[in-house]
A protein has these predicted regions:
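Conserved PLP-binding catalytic core of the aspartate aminotransferase-like
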Residues: 279, 291-325, 341, 345
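Active-site pre-lysine segment of PLP-dependent enzymes
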Residues: 141-154, 166-226
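Phosphate-binding glycine-rich loop
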Residues: 64, 69-109, 127
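PLP-dependent aminotransferase class I/II
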Residues: 67, 213-297
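N-terminal "arm"/small-domain region of PLP-dependent enzymes with the aminotransferase-like
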Residues: 1-62, 153-154
Length: 366
């Protein structure tokens, strides 16, 4: 006799959205020289956050505050909202899972872009949703195509990231606001803003929590350098934010992450420094791409997506050549986006390793 999995879970493949660098290092038997594939901040958290987390480590015998009271209050003050409009969770990925669970049942339709952030799709599949995708247009998620699919399919959810991962592209605030205004009230817009701190100031529409069908997601993993702490938050109309309490794991955000995020949020100087260093790293990555005859795409994130000039098979050979030389990078998973590789912002030393490895990877790719 075997355990009886649910009818939703039984047919799912035993895969994960991302193969981590640690898994690749174990397979290779050697550590990477440059870790430039996960869009982490190699510049690290605020020293004040590190100090706060170090002090909090001695108190980890206590459970976290399940209401995330202090962090929600600080975020509310930072954003000009009420703490009742904020949901804190163990990273955006978990919040996506809660969102799918909250709004969809097996067989319900969800709309996204083909090649967009795969973890959202992972949750849709895990809860039995029916995913309908539309193509990118000129390497950007296309609001018009998404909206057309919404009107045709009447989905429970529609996913849109601004800025976008994996392409680094973005839309100005007025275009995003137009999408918000056009989505019917019985469809929830899942607006992923994980990279918003890196984007031009006119990228994010104003925070309006009056619409119950718009949920915005932000994180401490990227600009704040706390990816390993697993902490992020959602911004929503009050009744929707409260609904998350029905299903979320109330002790899921660890105590050390809560304290670290609170200290990180308060250190504006460190955030400004990180944004400057990321902008400089993007320029360096772009220059390296140009020097090798490749095309760096415009980016409003902490990575640069580089068009390799041919098809996905060629880009995969370039990727493999970089990995063979100890440079961890990634690439989009579907055509035509997979003609590219994606390189995260790194230190000067990291990017020097990348610059040294790229010519050989291109030569070996043929």
């Amino acid at each position: 006799m075997q355990p009886r999995y649910t009818s939703v879970v039984a047919p799912l493949p035993s895969t994960v959205p991302f193969v981590g660098p640690e898994t690749q290092e174990r397979a290779r038997g050697v550590a990477f020289k440059a870790r430039l594939g996960a869009n982490e901040s190699v510049f690290g958290p605020s020293p004040k956050a590190i100090a706060a987390m170090r002090q909090a480590a001695a108190e980890c015998w206590m459970y976290c505050d399940p209401e995330n009271y202090d962090l929600k209050a600080a975020l509310a003050q930072e954003l000009g909202l009420s703490s009742t409009n904020i949901v804190v969770g163990e990273g955006i990925d978990a919040l996506f899972g809660y969102t799918v669970r909250l709004f969809t049942e097996p067989g319900d339709t969800v709309v996204s872009s083909l090649g967009a952030y795969p973890t959202f799709n992972f949750h849709v599949a895990g809860y039995g949703g029916r995913l309908v995708t539309v193509p990118y247009v000129s390497d950007r998620e296309d609001p018009a195509s998404l909206l057309a699919a919404v009107r045709r399919e009447r989905p429970k959810l529609v996913f849109f990231a601004n800025p976008d991962n994996p392409m680094g592209s973005w839309w100005p605030a007025d275009a995003v606001q137009a999408l918000i205004d056009a989505v019917p009230m019985d469809t929830v817009l899942v607006l992923d803003e994980a990279y918003i701190e890196f984007a031009p100031p006119e990228t994010a529409p104003r925070l309006d929590v009056s619409r119950p069908n718009v949920v915005r997601y932000r994180t401490f993993s990227k600009a704040y350098g706390m990816a390993g702490a697993r902490i992020g938050y959602a911004i929503a109309e009050e009744s929707v934010a409260k609904a998350f309490d029905k299903i979320r794991n109330h002790f899921s955000v660890n105590r050390i992450a809560q304290v670290g995020a609170l200290a990180a949020l308060a250190d504006r100087a460190h955030l400004a420094s990180v944004l400057e260093r990321v902008a400089s790293a993007r320029e360096t990555i772009g220059a390296t791409a140009h020097a090798n005859g490749l095309v760096p795409l415009p980016s409003a994130t902490n990575f640069v997506t580089i068009a390799c000039g041919r098809d996905g098979a060629y880009a995969k050979r370039v990727l493999d050549g970089l990995i063979a030389q100890g440079v961890f990078v990634r690439m989009p998973g579907v055509a035509p986006l997979n003609r590219c590789i994606r390189v995260s912002a790194g230190t000067a030393a990291d990017l020097a390793v990348f610059a040294e490895a790229l010519p050989r990877a291109l030569a070996d790719a043929g």
